Amino acid sequence: MKQSNSKNTPPIASKKVFIKTYGCQMNVYDSQRMNDSLSAQGYVTTQTPNDADLILVNTCHIREKAAEKLYSDLGRLRMMRQKRTSEKPLMIGVTGCVAQAEGDEILRRSPTVDLVVGPQMYHRLPELLQQAQQGKKIVETNYAVEDKFNHLPPHNKRAVQKRGVSAFLTVQEGCDKFCTFCVVPYTRGAEISRSVEQITDEARQLIEADVKEITLLGQNVNGWHGQSTDGKTWRLGDLLYHLAKLDGLKRLRYTTSHPRDMDESLIAAHRNLDILMPYLHLPVQSGSDRILKAMNRQHKAIDYLNLIEKIRTARPDIAFSGDFIVGFPGETDDDFEETIKLIEQVGYSSAYSFKYSPRPGTLGATMKNQVDEKVKNDRLQRLQALLLDQQHRFLRSKIGQTTDVLIEKDGRHPGQIVGRSPWLLPVVVDTQAPIGTVMAIQITNASSNSFVGEKANS
């Protein structure tokens, strides 16, 4: 991996940065990498905004009123800044997808902001911050010509160890699907895939920092493609086989996937790789073919159901989660009933569900037949009740089983530890074990969103 250009920037001594992160796992990853870049310049992370010399708000633009939430935060930061003295000034920056979408508008509405940086430009954060410290207002939302990942410093080993034994690793960014409800193609750009070399190098850095479980990230992660050292074209399944060979790694996951890109090699990886956890987040959004077409999802409900069956045949113990949108423009009662029917057929271990909210710049925002808010609320309530019932059923179905659990942290009470089940849901155990070990745990009980277990008899 090439060394970061940020190393040419003079170090900044004894400064503290606080990053507030909204949104998806990739935003969490991006915030961590921003911290790495700033750490290389002498910044240390603080969990207290009042202690910070620099506050960054890393934003998400997926849901309704994302910009308003940002401006509300910025109003509070403005008051915090006014209380500062000249001996401890406060710099304020906005990053992420709202930064990309709003750009100069953020400075117009909130002049207290010093810099606005889009998700493809945060590798330049140290140099942009230096310019802002000299009094220049920064808006950098272009798409970088250079590969940003080649210009990020290596992971800060101590910071990785502090975060825990599970880590995210971005392998793919952007989306070319252009679903009519989604802003991702406009805020994250076209699909790009990181090289096998980059990914392997970063995975090794994480493993050397005691990470045991890596989740590969992408807006359309199973759209990843690359080349092996001998020039063969690889898809995500091939990459998983490759990473599974790394010494010290105990678990692999990936998210988020599009049904159209679930190819045979990826399904085979679920069948053949024990290191690949039996959990898959596979959004569908609706069970109505008419609505799926209006959303430009590029598949029908039966295609999704057939895919679920094929994956379950390959890995019978797999748990599925999904995404659902109710109240998309033109959705009728019959369309909604088709979604309910699909959920009943699949049986999810967990899921995310939302009311449709028009996103500026998307085709969905211009569609007629917008659904009444009360209807959306009623449908969402019914859908979430069904999904919650399925989650409870899934949790209870595991009682009495013994499964391997990755121990992640100490529990709330003395003598208690918390681990991660293969199905992603947490497990609370009254025992002691080193963080990072994988233990055989018998599930003895379940709450609404976690398991309770005990160390299995050997």
From Swiss-Prot:
Record's keyword annotation contains Metal-binding: yes
The keyword Iron-sulfur is assigned to this record: yes
Protein name listed in UniProt: tRNA-2-methylthio-N(6)-dimethylallyladenosine synthase
Annotated PROSITE patterns: MTTASE_N, MTTASE_RADICAL, RADICAL_SAM, TRAM
Annotated compartments: Cytoplasm
Enzymatic reactions: N(6)-dimethylallyladenosine(37) in tRNA + (sulfur carrier)-SH + AH2 + 2 S-adenosyl-L-methionine = 2-methylsulfanyl-N(6)-dimethylallyladenosine(37) in tRNA + (sulfur carrier)-H + 5'-deoxyadenosine + L-methionine + A + S-adenosyl-L-homocysteine + 2 H(+)
Binding site for [4Fe-4S] cluster 2: C175, C179, C182
Cystine crosslinks: none
CDD domains per the UniProt record, alphabetical: Radical_SAM
MTTase N-terminal domain residues: 15-134
Keyword annotations: 4Fe-4S, Cytoplasm, Iron, Iron-sulfur, Metal-binding, S-adenosyl-L-methionine, Transferase, tRNA processing
EC number, UniProt record: 2.8.4.3
SUPFAM superfamilies: Radical SAM enzymes
Domain annotation TRAM: ranges: 396-457
Binding site for [4Fe-4S] cluster 1: C24, C60, C97
Signal peptide (residue range): none
Superkingdom, natural source: Bacteria
Origin species: Bartonella bacilliformis (strain ATCC 35685 / KC583 / Herrer 020/F12,63)
GO cellular component, one term: cytosol
Complex formation: Monomer.
Family, as annotated: Belongs to the methylthiotransferase family. MiaB subfamily.
Upper taxonomic lineage: Bacteria, Pseudomonadati, Pseudomonadota, Alphaproteobacteria, Hyphomicrobiales
Function: Catalyzes the methylthiolation of N6-(dimethylallyl)adenosine (i(6)A), leading to the formation of 2-methylthio-N6-(dimethylallyl)adenosine (ms(2)i(6)A) at position 37 in tRNAs that read codons beginning with uridine.
Cofactor details (free text): Binds 2 [4Fe-4S] clusters. One cluster is coordinated with 3 cysteines and an exchangeable S-adenosyl-L-methionine.
